[in-house]
A protein has these predicted regions:
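Extreme N-terminal starter segment of soluble prokaryotic enzymes
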Residues: 1-5, 34
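Gly/serine-rich nucleotide phosphate-binding loop at the start of the catalytic core
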Residues: 7-16
Length: 210
């Protein structure tokens, strides 16, 4: 029996999978075939989560969550099911599993394949996104999928990434806002208020982020 280990970085991403409260850094059974691990942001956290899931006996790994667009054609809500992951090396995706999932999606879902790039930190300018796109040829970027793909490759188990575009090329969260984000992606409201009061973040930018 296949057991899929889902690695998610953000609490909001976990809520897309289950309405249950998901603690950080703990294996949570979603159903008999799926377990979830809320890792927090970044490659190191995702790597540890994937390794723990492998030790727990999962037979395949998936990186689930959001991504930033590197292609101007991509819009928020588009779904990226990549062909490969561009990290330190070009990492494979289990295309049979990916294709099976893609064929089960609603025809209303905009699905994009191609390459998903890795970034060690959030990209906060259009210029940095376009530069990474030029270097990698990727259509989107995240901070965790490369780490999960590496663990899967080392364990010789299948891997896919499932990433929804959250910010287009022309808009990115301001760098100052990142200091107000907790490890699970939730907001430190007092820190955000302080940033607004000292005008580090225009209130219009927060409204644009929805």
């Amino acid at each position: 029996m296949n057991v899929t280990g889902l690695v998610v970085a953000l609490r909001a991403e976990a809520l897309c999978v289950t309405p249950l409260h998901v603690p950080m850094n703990k294996e949570i059974a979603i159903n008999p075939h799926t377990v979830l691990w809320l890792s927090g942001m970044g490659a190191e956290s995702a790597k540890k989560a994937a390794e723990q899931l492998c030790h727990a006996g999962v037979t395949r790994l998936a990186s689930f969550g959001v991504a930033g667009a590197l292609d101007k054609q991509l819009k928020p809500g588009d779904l990226v099911l990549p062909d490969a992951i561009y990290g330190e090396n070009l990492l494979p995706v289990a295309l049979d599993w990916r294709n099976h999932l893609q064929h089960r999606l609603s025809s209303n879902t905009v699905v994009v394949n191609g390459v998903l790039a890795n970034s060690a930190e959030p990209l906060t300018t259009m210029q940095s996104k376009l530069r990474l796109a030029e270097i990698t040829g990727a259509c989107a970027v995240d901070m965790e999928s490369s780490a999960v793909a590496t663990v899967a490759a080392d364990a010789a188990i299948p891997f896919i990434a499932i990433r929804a575009i959250v910010d287009p090329v022309e808009f990115s969260p301001p760098g100052a806002l990142l200091s107000a984000v907790k490890p699970d992606g939730s907001a430190n409201l007092l820190r955000i208020l302080a940033l607004i009061l000292n005008r580090s973040i225009p209130i219009g930018t927060l409204l644009q982020m929805g």
